[in-house]
Amino acid sequence: MSLSSGGWTRASPPAQSSSSHLGHEASQSACSTVLMSVKVSVCHSGIRPLCLPGAGDESLRLQLSMDPGKAGEFRLALRDISATAAGRSVFIAEFDLKTVQYEVKTPLCHELSLATPPHDRISFKFRCEQEAQEWATVVMSSLREAHRVAISSSTEEGRLPPPPLATQSKAPMPRTEEICAELVSAIEAGDVRSASVCASSLAKQKAALSIQPSKRNYTDSEVCLAVVVEDASSSCCVSVKVFPHSTIGALKQQVFSDYGFHPRVQRWVIGQSLCSDHRSLASYGVQRDGDTAFLYLISARQARLSRGIYQQDQESALLMVPTTHQAHQEAVSNGPAALNTASRPYSTLPTRLHNSHNTLSNNAGGSERLGLSDIRDLINLELPQLNEALGPNRTSIQPGWACPTCTYINKPTRPGCEMCSADRPEGYTVPGNYRPDALELRRIQQEKEAIRQYQQARETERRENFARLVQMDGQDLVPNPERVECRICYVELESGEGVLLRECLHCFCKECLRSVILMSEDPQVACPYRDESYACDCVLQEREIRALVSVDDYQHWLQRGLSVAESRCEGSYHCATADCPGWCVYEDTVNTFHCPVCKKQNCLLCKAIHEGMNCKQYQDDLTARAINDSAARRTRDLLKTLVNSGEAMHCPQCGIIVQKKEGCDWLRCTVCHTEICWVTRGPRWGPKGPGDISGGCRCNVNKQRCHPKCQNCH
């Protein structure tokens, strides 16, 4: 743990190299004194690394010097020390500190920009946070001193002072830093009294401080963090390897590098708390594998993120050195001797062009200094190799199809997304040269086996259902499978107590159905189900009626059906024997009917039984008896009078005389059961029976009455 006036930071082991020099040392020129020098790697405009011929990341050094004879005269130079062994010192660029702006972007990345147009920028990458913080402290102090002297000189000469340059932190006083160091030592040693004295002294100075535990307080092993990623329309789960001592800001950079979500659009929530960038994961309770964090993504417009800024930051993130997690792990595992190796930045650049290095080295000379335009030319020399290294042909494309819902890359033969179960795009086809791996072949085999088992189970179920239906069809009555209420008597029927009608699946109790059968005048017994909006028009089957009623009632129902069939048949003839139920359907070529019931011979021409006489003899005998029988004559005259006066009519089907006593204009013939419209003296329905409007009186068709005097013929 370390403490400075600029803020608490995680302490790194002291650098064993001689790359950082504090104090005063002689410079190459006799008129300047070097204040500090530090090794860096350079990125121009935050996009591509500064590629110098023959100069690796370890050969570039930032140097801050001052002129002792002139107050506020500071020079910031970028040197190439790769040619030091040959006795040459190459100054790549040198700036007057009053003409630049210096900004701390991240703990390991600083940016230098010109105060005057074209405002060119150079970004520096440092090896460790401790070196970068010490360098920033010295540079910021020198920068403020240079500006103060410039403002004083401008005031004395009557000129307006230049506008203030952007700085990142206030200049720490030496005494404050000493107290911070003493406080760190006292806390690490457990000296409560000394720590209290130092804390009181800092409180009296009102020093701006921030505290953060050192990495040594955390475990060195990575943990697997379960991250639930959500935006306004979708969500998914990913796993991220992190260290508990990592900050939220470092986690945002890691997600940016791995998944492309810019830190500005990331909102982290851990333990129902909105996370701050400077706090560590351990402070939010992340300690072991499986701990959960929530990442909410906002829109780029809401985060005020433009496409140019995103591309610039993305390219910078791809070329940045690895995180301090890996360097810390290597330093802890290998000891202090491995610190230089652990803190050495990795390079993603291709191999340098040695011929370009030799040419530029010869042209540069020992002490030649380059401007920003020359630096840009040096960068352009390495662009072909850099573009080749970052080209798309170097990237291996994973075979498969991308899920349109969650964008997961699935294997070509998979029919649905492995993550969200979405269907595979219809236009996708499996490549012809694709060969599935062992796991995919196993999955395909398991799918085939699952389909086979499903088809087998479905076939077994079909056979069981068919057997159940065959067994049920052999029963005359189908019992109700579950508890139900009879819609006639409203009695609750347990399973098996009621009867489920085959035609309509309506359920009633046996007693109610038996009563409906016995009370029905029509041989076709209709289903008794009725409600406010529906009347069932299905009928009971013959075997259902046979199973519900007794044998005598069943025979009576059959006889009733025969009677109705006889009356509705046009060519029917009933046996003339009294109380004989026999009847027949005659044809034109047949003149006699031998009744199978009473064994009598009926004459179909005379409609009578005249055994021993022919038809002529029977007609003469009938005429003679009618003349002498006054009762028969009076009956005949009365019926003719009723028909002529309109009080009676002949049935349009069988011709017998029917009479309406009272009520509506609908009546039914007692012989043939034909429905008759009294006002029109014709049949109510067409030849197909009830409901046929192709004939009959057509009453209420198109909302029109059949006759102006119609009194509801139904």
Curated annotation (Swiss-Prot):
Q: Does Kinase count among this protein's keywords?
A: no
Which pathway features in its UniProt record?
Protein modification; protein ubiquitination
Task: Tell me the enzyme class.
Answer: transferase
Query: Which pairs are disulfide-linked?
Result: none
Q: Please tell me where Zn(2+) 3 binds in this chain.
A: 575, 580, 595, 598
Q: Where does Zn(2+) 5 bind?
A: 651, 654, 669, 672
**Residues at the active site:** 664
| Domain Ubiquitin-like: from-to ranges | 225-301
Chain segments annotated as coiled-coil in the UniProt record: none
Q: Which UniProt keywords apply?
A: Metal-binding, Repeat, Transferase, Ubl conjugation pathway, Zinc, Zinc-finger
Q: Which Gene3D superfamilies match?
A: 1.20.120.1750, Phosphatidylinositol 3-kinase Catalytic Subunit, Chain A, domain 1 (3.10.20.90), Pleckstrin-homology domain (PH domain)/Phosphotyrosine-binding domain (PTB) (2.30.29.30), Zinc/RING finger domain, C3HC4 (zinc finger) (3.30.40.10), Zn-finger domain of Sec23/24 (2.30.30.380)
- The source's domain of life comes to Eukaryota
Keyword Oxidoreductase, does the record have it?
no
Under CDD domains, the record lists: BRcat_RBR_HOIL1, mRING-HC-C3HC3D_RBR_HOIL1, PH_SHARPIN, Rcat_RBR_HOIL1, Ubl_HOIL1
Tell me what reaction this enzyme catalyses: [E2 ubiquitin-conjugating enzyme]-S-ubiquitinyl-L-cysteine + [acceptor protein]-L-lysine = [E2 ubiquitin-conjugating enzyme]-L-cysteine + [acceptor protein]-N(6)-ubiquitinyl-L-lysine
* ZnF (RanBP2-type) residues: 394-426
Zn finger limits (RING-type)? 486-536, 651-680
Write down the EC number: 2.3.2.31
Q: Where is the composition biased (Polar residues)?
A: 14-23
Q: What does this protein do?
A: Component of the LUBAC complex which conjugates linear ('Met-1'-linked) polyubiquitin chains to substrates and plays a key role in NF-kappa-B activation and regulation of inflammation. LUBAC conjugates linear polyubiquitin to ikbkg and RIPK1 and is involved in activation of the canonical NF-kappa-B and the JNK signaling pathways. Linear ubiquitination mediated by the LUBAC complex interferes with TNF-induced cell death and thereby prevents inflammation.
Domain comment text?
A: The RanBP2-type zinc finger, also called Npl4 zinc finger (NZF), mediates binding to 'Met-1'-linked polyubiquitins. The UBL domain mediates association with RNF31 via interaction with its UBA domain.
Please give the name of this protein.
RanBP-type and C3HC4-type zinc finger-containing protein 1
Q: Please name the source species.
A: Danio rerio
Q: What is the lineage of its organism?
A: Eukaryota, Metazoa, Chordata, Craniata, Vertebrata
Q: Which gene encodes it?
A: rbck1
